[in-house]
Amino acid sequence: MLHLTKPQKETIYMKITRVLLAALFLVTPLMFFTDLTENPFQVQNTVLYVLLALIYATMAVKFLRSKTIDFTKTFFDLAFFVYVIVCAVTWLSAVSSEPQALRQTMFYNMLNYGTLLLVVALGAYVVSKNVVFSGVIESKTNYILLFIVWGALWLLLPYLHTMLSADNLFARMFDWYAVLLWAAGIWLGMRVLKKVTQENIIVLVFISVFLACVYGVLQALGLEFLWPFEMSQFASKAFSTFGNPNFLSSAVVMLLPAIAVYFLRAESKKDMLVYGFLTLVYLLYLSFGLARSCWLGAACGFIMMWMFGSLRSLVWGRRLRAFLLILLAFGVLYGSAYFGGSKSPVAARAEELSQVTPSNFTLDVDKDHIFQSLHQRLFMWDVSKEIFLSRPVMGAGLGNFQMAFAQNQYKTLLKHPNLRELKARTNAPHNEVFFQLAQGGIVGVGLFLFMFMVLFLEVKDFASHKKEGDKKQLLQAVFCGILGMLVDNMLNISLHAVVPAFIFWWFVGAEVSGVGKEDRTVAITVNPVTKTVGLAVLAFCGAVIVWQGLVLCSYFRGYEGLKLQASGQVKEAQANYARALALYPANTEAGLRLGNTYLQEHDYKNALTAYEKTLSAAAYYDEVYFNAALAALGAGEEEKAVRYLTEHLKLSPFNLRAYVMLGSLIRQDVIYANDDNLKLLDRGVHLFPYAAELWTTLGDIYVKRDETEFAKNLYKRGLTADTLDRTLLQNLKRLYKKTQEELPPIAAQAQRIQDLHVKAANYWSQSVSGRRKLRTDIEAYIKDFPNDTNGPVLLALYFNQAGNALKSKELLEGVLKEHPEDLSANLALSSLLYRAEQTQDAVYYLKSALFYYPENLTATKRLAALGKK
């Protein structure tokens, strides 16, 4: 936008810009409230958006007043701007192809997620590429030491904390002591940025990330001092001020190569000690953060440093210093893994990688061998592939990944039912290439890869032709940080978190302006067109500030409602939820909770209104659809209940209760029995073959529709799945009697085993010879029908009553080895183990039964009874 290097006579616009830049790089990463919003980093997001908007507003006013402005033109601009434009086009393409009901949701998708690219990424890049590299690394260690003192002063906050009496957002955020500290910090930041150069901005980033790392290390050691009450749920976790250890770890990955260059080029012992200390703290936090993808990213960044000849010669020239740092780094990393004489979470986290083997690197995995970190990612990548296949050219559209993920994950779940508990709502799949493929299709991922290929080639050319020096080595280190971040985001989502994404795109802008040809500027003067653009930028900045204010107030009110609800003040909670939803309709959690409170009070109409308002902004939220169906049912609106249940089951295919409810509604009024709904119910009996009520309900629907043959086939399928279901057998007999046809073989088979089951249940009333005959008959049945698991289960029951628990257990384990979803076998084996006082194993099989049949009454009651003992 303009060269931001401080001129000889500083203008008011430059002063304002320096203040905003100091706040942007210092306040944003460190401002952290856990008692304002449920998502602790929501305040950070708002502050960053507002500060970026203010910087652009300042530049726009400067342009309108001074009548001229200079843009720095770089080799990267065309590729990046084309990528941004194409992303916007993908959103328009998606909107035009989706039904009207989804378009409001897609608008909020753009606000929630699309603006990360359009505001944060683009905004950071454009400002950054207009800040120059001076070519000189100045000593700023005095300021770093002052900032360490400044950070230590925050230890006094719990003792000097003040709070205004009013109960609003401003009063909760305001604190006189904190205001003084922030003012002092921004003033120090302005001193660091006395010359606004990339080198000085990098130092300011060093400082803020270092202070965040120190706080995170203290948290990991259990020394929480700022938020002792609100942070209790984060005990021994290094969340720091980024709200997520992965996000701060990603920032560390980007900074490690650069701070290594500062350390190696330090001319004084003081500089060497300070930068060395910062490096060790970064490494310590990286270890405590437990983010393995960041460990990989950092390793790749360091390996890339060794690939550059100038950095290699720098390391070799300062090899004694480098060796000492490496030695200390290994000591720090080893100490973090084995401090206190025992293995820490760091070592345990590293050892978990041994669970990743070629045999389980697949989605076809048994539920007991699911490795969460691995299979959650494999699952999300497979869903991303499904999104891409549904729209291969333009993808789901900018900002629409979360919606598309919710709409497509059922495909993967149905192919791999053992992964049902990995079902998720996410805005990124922990792999940036899959994200770009799903969001932008072939066009989007192609432009994304091309964009960074252009950067990599330019860096290669720069490394080959430029002379040695501070600028060259620092730019190569920044590039290594960018590469490390990209590697990290092959398994992480920090590029979709506001603060690390901002730092990343700032570094990209810095790298682009540094390695490209110098003095390539475009002067723009005021004319009717450019003036209109300037005014539009100013209006857009104002809109961003207002929007972010509404978002923050909404999430504040939503969190207040949650705390009031937890304390039993339901009416006050409802008022806060309603205000939150009115301020920002895309606050889906507030809308869901508002509806839930009304639903608990049996106020079905208000509950339905709240749910429907929430769905208008989040038409992919399966839980809201289900609860809306309950509310509609209570309000007597069966048509809406059916519609919401069908939408829910499209998104969440393993909700047995929803299938049963839908079937009951359709049985009551077969007008709702269209092909789509019948297909859903048929899918339900396929997924839950032991759900007798579901088979019966669907059969009754076919009978009511005079589709007797469909009903017959359904009952036969049901009996094939569970030959012990008496209701299905009776219904099948009744239909065949009505049509005077001969009963099918499955009926005779079911009657045979049901008769045997009655005899087995009356085992103790039979004679010895009768018991022997019963065993012979059961074994004959198993021989005749080896694929029916009810045979071995019944034989296991016989042996258990005969006192041979070992044989009974062997039979049941054999059934479950081949058919782990068998409900009868799971329940029978849990009872057997409980009587053998093997409670832990009994609990396992009860949980297994509930995994395949959620809310099964027998398993739920037994598990609850075991939990009390």
Each predicted region: which residue ranges?
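Alpha-helical transmembrane segments of multi-pass inner-membrane proteins
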Residues: 2-3, 8-9, 15-31, 49-60, ...
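Interfacial juxtamembrane loops and adjacent helix segments
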Residues: 224-239, 343-383, 387-389, 398-438
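Hydrophobic alpha-helical transmembrane segments in integral membrane proteins
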Residues: 335-351, 530-568
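Helix-start (N-cap) detector for alpha-helical repeat units in TPR-like alpha-solenoids
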Residues: 554-557, 588-589, 604, 621-623, ...
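Register position in tetratricopeptide repeats
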Residues: 566, 600, 634, 668-669, ...
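Canonical positions in the second alpha-helix
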Residues: 579-580, 613-614, 647-648, 683-684, ...
